[in-house]
């Protein structure tokens, strides 16, 4: 997702931690988690 990458890059979940990432992107649902976990 280009929008996600522009917003904070693919390393966003590493920088802030998975808990923060999931909470921050809760509106994106599991789709966001799947993309970032891989």
From Swiss-Prot:
Q: Keyword annotations for this protein? A: Antibiotic, Antimicrobial, Biomineralization, Fungicide, Phosphoprotein, Secreted
Q: Where does the record place Basic residues bias?
A: 8-30
Q: What does this protein do?
A: Histatins (Hsts) are cationic and histidine-rich secreted peptides mainly synthesized by saliva glands of humans and higher primates. Hsts are considered to be major precursors of the protective proteinaceous structure on tooth surfaces (enamel pellicle).
Cellular localization per UniProt: Secreted
Q: What are its GO biological-process terms?
A: biomineral tissue development; defense response to bacterium; defense response to fungus; killing of cells of another organism; positive regulation of cell-cell adhesion; positive regulation of metabolic process; positive regulation of substrate adhesion-dependent cell spreading; positive regulation of vascular wound healing
Record-listed Phosphoserine modification sites: 2
Region Disordered: start-end pairs: 1-38
Q: Supply the name of the protein.
A: Histatin-1
Which Gene Ontology cellular-component terms appear in the entry?
A: endoplasmic reticulum; extracellular region; mitochondrion
Say yes or no: keyword Phosphoprotein present.
Answer: yes
Q: Which family is it part of? A: Belongs to the histatin/statherin family.
């Amino acid at each position: 997702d280009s929008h996600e990458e522009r917003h904070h890059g693919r390393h966003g979940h590493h920088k802030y931690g998975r808990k923060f990432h999931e909470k921050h992107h809760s509106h994106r649902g599991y789709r966001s988690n799947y993309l970032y976990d891989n």
